[in-house]
Regions:
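Catalytic core of pol beta-like nucleotidyltransferases
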Residues: 1-25, 34-39, 50-98
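Short beta-strand->loop micro-motif that forms the acidic, two-metal-ion catalytic signature
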Residues: 44-47
């Protein structure tokens, strides 16, 4: 489950993510992974999906938007992250969701 989201909303997000072809793992990071989130915190997700392209990421983001949930989802493809500090943060505090 995603911390701070109602169980039904969290389940809807995870079910949608499970449908994505080529998705090997989903890691929650940021304030929700560290337990420091508040009601307006976004949901930071790092996707381990080497075969996905930016177009796929945009479509996945649009599908998440179609759920009409009140949170913003920040999606990152791990193989496209070029900021060493962000990768270190994800590896240090990340929580595998899928």
């Amino acid at each position: 489950m995603i911390p701070g989201l109602p169980a039904a909303d969290s389940a809807a997000v995870l079910a949608l993510l499970k449908q994505q072809q080529g998705l090997e793992q989903v890691v929650l990071y940021g304030s929700r992974a560290m337990g420091r989130h508040h009601s307006g915190s976004d949901v930071d997700l790092c996707l381990l999906a080497p075969s996905l392209h930016l177009e796929d990421l945009l479509l996945l983001g649009a599908r998440l938007d179609d759920l009409l949930l009140p949170w913003r989802f920040d999606l990152q493809l791990k193989h496209r992250i070029d900021h060493p500090g962000l990768i270190e943060h994800i590896e240090r505090v990340g929580v595998a969701l899928l």
